[in-house]
């Protein structure tokens, strides 16, 4: 029960930080709905990212997915979260749990689609 309250407090604190600094929002939760994750695509410098991501190479998309993992690590401070969240090009249970904890429900489908796009 105490662990739940600690996690809940950490989550609330991170949400408060997001509200205070919307321009630095890692998940762009305050962006308008028409702002899509699937904007322009680049085909250069693929080696900068995980080689297991063999789908569409979109830096902005990969950055947003990676930011979910970074924020999840910052909330829970578990060493394995950062690596497991990115494994299999974000197509794993840890990423899905992080997404559910950190993102508003209306963005879940958009991020699931993004994972499918980069991991094909």
From Swiss-Prot:
GO terms for cellular component: extracellular region. InterPro entries: Crust_neurhormone_CS, Crust_neurohorm, Crust_neurohorm_sf, Hyperglycemic, Hyperglycemic1. It comes from the Eukaryota. GO terms for biological process: circadian rhythm; glucose metabolic process; neuropeptide signaling pathway. GO terms for molecular function: neuropeptide hormone activity. Keywords: Amidation, Carbohydrate metabolism, Cleavage on pair of basic residues, Disulfide bond, Glucose metabolism, Hormone, Neuropeptide, Secreted, Signal. The modification Valine amide is found at residue 118. Disulfide bonds join 53-89, 69-85, 72-98. Hormone found in the sinus gland of isopods and decapods which controls the blood sugar level. Has a secretagogue action over the amylase released from the midgut gland. May act as a stress hormone and may be involved in the control of molting and reproduction. It is found in: Secreted. Residues 1-27 form the signal peptide. It comes from Penaeus japonicus (Kuruma prawn). Gene3D superfamilies: Crustacean CHH/MIH/GIH neurohormone. This is Crustacean hyperglycemic hormones 2. Belongs to the arthropod CHH/MIH/GIH/VIH hormone family. Its main location: secreted.
